[in-house]
Amino acid sequence: MANKDAALKALIEPVVTAMGFELWGVDYLSQGKHSRLVIYIESADGVTVDDCAAVSRQVSGVLDVEDPISGEYRLEVSSPGMDRPLFTLEQFASFKGSHVKVKLSTPFEGRRKFQGQLAGVEGDEILLHLDGQEYCFPIESIEQARVVPQFDN
């Protein structure tokens, strides 16, 4: 997780938790005038559009006061969904056996994108089975990771 994301998470998490939700993750995408702050929330009872709107209002108030992001940005609050992003080692461990897409911050063996079966977590590395090989990636080298839903015919 980037330093900016970690700082935003520390600011946002108490608000989300106080509202009865779990903060699944925070993703700040700096793209000039089109920057986005995406907050993923989860609940045992599920997440509705009204839940997202309520969290958005509360978090927006905190962000307006604390002002951790310079310039304009769009705030989005969402459930993680079926193709949920993975941010922490605990999240990776809980999706062991699932298919995942991983994008690295720097190339490994000439490429940055990998898709395969999540074999587990060892220390601070995730293990990925791909084309009969096992790859180990330190969590800090992962720029993005998502679960790839599998549908049976």
Curated annotation (Swiss-Prot):
InterPro entries: Ribosome_maturation_RimP, RimP_C, RimP_C_sf, RimP_N, RimP_N_sf. This is Ribosome maturation factor RimP. Belongs to the RimP family. SUPFAM superfamilies: YhbC-like, C-terminal domain, YhbC-like, N-terminal domain. It is found in: Cytoplasm. One of its GO terms (biological process) is ribosomal small subunit assembly. Required for maturation of 30S ribosomal subunits. The keyword Cytoplasm applies. GO terms for cellular component: cytosol. It comes from Chromohalobacter salexigens (strain ATCC BAA-138 / DSM 3043 / CIP 106854 / NCIMB 13768 / 1H11). Pfam families: DUF150_C, RimP_N. Keywords: Cytoplasm, Ribosome biogenesis.
